[in-house]
Amino acid sequence: MIITIDGPAGAGKSSIARRVASELGFEFLDTGAMYRAVTWGVMQQGIAWDDVESLVEFADAAQLIWQDDRIYLDNQDISEEIRTPQVTSHIRYLADPPRIRERITAQQRRIATGRDIVTEGRDQGTEVFPDAHCKIFLTASPEERARRRQRQLAENGRVMSVEEILAAQNQRDLEDRMRPVGRLRAASDAIVVQTDGMSPDEVREEVLRLVRECVQASAANSASSDVTR
């Protein structure tokens, strides 16, 4: 079974997806780690960022494995190596070009085959797993997301005004909605969860409730299909 959780930056998708996966006994698929892994591999190979053909070729040949919350590239565990600022600053070269994104999307589908997965992003329910059993679109107002981000930064010793965060966030939202491939949008069959004023625990419980309803409905449909055969 595949459960997708999409939404804008700052909506809390990653933390909620991990908690939901843990509660259900599912695996959490960190699709961002996959883009980071390919980015790291490109850096190790010294491929130029403007050499799109070579980038596509590398993404096509890369052997990605996601196991026990660890990411492997060509059988090498690089789960720590991909979390550097250098990798972060270059992800866009792999995440934006449509041809490269298609290759990594194919790898995500391959990894998810036959597994119970919770995955999050901005296009998981629309582009990557359009036939997912349950699709959640997690969102909040721009102001709410900016306040949450400010609190997260403060916990790590960084100080930024809500206004600064909001301006950067609005720009990213605009860019994410305008992307030619994998743009930010709710799938037509996604359940939209508006989280303004909700605590992380309240969001988790609401998402779990919705997911369990999806699981029950899926089981009922499967049983009905078996009866009619």
From Swiss-Prot:
CDD domains: CMPK. Gene3D superfamilies: P-loop containing nucleotide triphosphate hydrolases. Its main location: cytoplasm. The keyword Membrane does not apply. ATP binds at residues 7-15. It comes from the Bacteria. GO terms for cellular component: cytosol. GO terms for molecular function: (d)CMP kinase activity; ATP binding; CMP kinase activity; dCMP kinase activity. Its EC number is 2.7.4.25. Pfam families: Cytidylate_kin. Belongs to the cytidylate kinase family. Type 1 subfamily. This is Cytidylate kinase. It comes from Rhodopirellula baltica (strain DSM 10527 / NCIMB 13988 / SH1).
